[in-house]
């Protein structure tokens, strides 16, 4: 019985983290959204299905953790791309950053 409660708590935390990540990614995400309703339906359906049919007891929890990892990684990638977008610096700018000065080019 204690292990079932522990599994429920971990599954709940995973779902809570997924919801948190979805809120960060999609500002319109709310309990009224289709994504939220689908997530809750799957969680409720899984409680019954896992006990009856699943070969691996925590298979759906593993899938949920994988999905959480995917959402989190995608969000972090987007944040990094947004932060560092803008292209590369010119040779002159890069040299100036490290305190170097390029020799002057003679005009022909």
Swiss-Prot record:
Where, if anywhere, are coiled coils annotated? Answer: none
- Source organism superkingdom: Eukaryota
GO CC, sorted alphabetically, is: mitochondrion
Q: Which family does it belong to?
A: Belongs to the FMC1 family.
Q: What is the name of this protein?
A: Protein FMC1 homolog
Q: Which organism is it from?
A: Caenorhabditis elegans
